[in-house]
Amino acid sequence: MIDSRFRLLLVLAAAALGPSASALQLPKVFTDGAVLQRDRAVPVWGSAAAGKQVVVKFAGQEKSTRAAADGKWRIDLDALPASAEGRVLEVREEGGAKLEVKDLLVGEVWLASGQSNMEWPISRSRPEDQAIAASGPVPLLRVLTVPKKLSAYRLDDFDGRWQAATPDSVRHFSAVAYFFGRRLTEELGIPVGMIHSSWGGSRIEPWLADEGLAGIPDLREMRDFRKARSPGTAEYDHLMRRHLKATRAWIDAAARALHERRPLPGQPSAPPQLPLGHGQALGTYQAMIHPLVPYGIRGFLWYQGESNLGEGMLYTLKMEALIKGWRQQFGVPAAPFLFVQLAPYHYGDNREGALPAIWVAQQHVLKLPHTGMAVTMDIGNPADIHPTHKSEVARRLALWALADTYGKPGIVKSGPLFEKMEIAGDAIRIRFSGAPTGLTTRDGKPPSHFEVAGPDWNFQPATAEIAAGEALVTLRSDAVKSPVMARFAWRQAAEPNLMNREGLPAAAFHSHWPDDPVLGRNLALQRPFTASDPNPSGWNSGLTDGSWHGAAGTCFATGAAPGFPKHVTIDLGRAREVHTARFGVPEFGATRTVVLSLSEDGKQFQEIGKHEFPGKSKAATELRWDKRPARFIRASFPDHHGKLDQYDENHAFLTELEVYGPTQ
């Protein structure tokens, strides 16, 4: 018979754990000093005893609901106008339990996230910025930091509290978030709440709400992969149930084997999970963003990308997923999403094209509605990945918010952005947007960091001339008599001098990357590939990276095993209609004939053309055919030249392989 005292303890423990006895609670985003979002419904939520009535009172409103079986409840207050009057939010549970949150303001709320440059505190910013923050409190500004934490599951709460923006409270707060919020209070004259949730060194993947991956065909594989490895999803639960069934069968089989003194059978492996970590695939959204959902906010700030360097246009797709997912989770489908383009920095001699590719990928995010990009080409430090001029970064983000979100007239929000290119004989004309009153340079010298090239993609420095009163630059180069393409600031440490007359810098561009003006999008860009003779030294990264640089170690190379033919096969991810391929070889190596073939299933390949390259010459060619569906494109190397330089003739080299299909 169970001891009565033990029975009592069991009853008390069950009551304490059960939702029916849950104490009335609010998440930490509702603490004294909070700012509520104006001009839209205000969600208030928490937990209480199951079935109990919950009443919320604020600013003359009183609304009620009942807690669900799991104790959760939510009430949406009617939209409120901005107010700097500190008022009390009262939440009462049927039976007498009551909570009060004091000194609540109503205004604008923004969520700032990313990696170290967003996390970078005022205390480590430039002295001028520190002096501004130390000069006194900002009465209309409140700040909240979500502490660093990881979780494989979506959490409901976090440890943190709102604070008034005083010199002491903001010293270790995000400098970008602080100066952005401060700027809004000055321009709007209403309360502003800045929520900061970032982690230095984090990749974009752990910040994703997986709902954002839906509807992006090129991320379908990523979506399916994550679903099958994320605890709590239907796909993972199905795999786990199957694993448990197999484990039970194994236990029975193991017991029989033990009884019969036979070797135990192999134990079933548990379904794999996404790796947890701020630099991995999972964890920061679940613990640092989701606990804020569905708090009323106006928009998002984002400063990240260094940890995803090398992904090129794949980063654009991940940004799209991030933006869609956050907007969906917070219930704000048109919320502004403002982000910072990375500053120049020397990441290494073998990564010269990686940062320009991310710059272009970030600029392509502007095609999504209600987005904005602050360019930082002129305020970085090529020797320091953490430039300290954070107040100017924040000012440039605020220009987008003030112009687009708040409709302030007369604001030029962006610097010059590439608009179109025109060929004019021996010259190329580049027209920019973002320069309504014309172009200039910050040092009074001719525009720097422009290059032009012919069909061989061999870029040479170009002289640049600004057309008076126009957003137009004319480029020429004595080394390229018939230019067909141009690029600007296509170096990781580039600090060009071109800007608009409002002082905002021009963004880097490439007229033919990632989209060819005639052929459209390169379908092979960033796609995976496999080689029949893999290079053991890692010279296999350059085939689909979008760079025609062709330097040793950065282009594609097979191994040097004797015996030809060899081949490399690109997987486009799904069957696509294709009609053109562009490929080339570096000036070194013994690559001779390259044969291209297509396949829908990866087994049966059909040859569509070939090209023979001369030795010791950087060269590129283009093959065209009647459009046909293909998922796999293979480059085969049936032969080679004799040994021409220091490289073994059994290596096969390619600088790049691009694939094009009909434009959508």
PLM regions with names:
Residues K57-A59, A453, A489-R491, S532, ...:
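Predominantly extracellular/luminal cell-surface or secreted proteins
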Residues H512-Q526, G661-Q664:
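Low-complexity, Pro/Thr/Ser/Gly/Ala-rich linker/spacer regions in secreted
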Residues M1-L9:
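Bacterial N-terminal signal peptides that target proteins for export
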Residues L519, G538, W548-G609, S617-Q664:
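Aromatic, loop-rich ligand-recognition surfaces of beta-strand-rich domains
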Residues S22-L519:
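Cell-envelope and extracellular/periplasmic
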Residues L519-H549:
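Predominantly extracellular/luminal regions of secreted and cell-surface proteins
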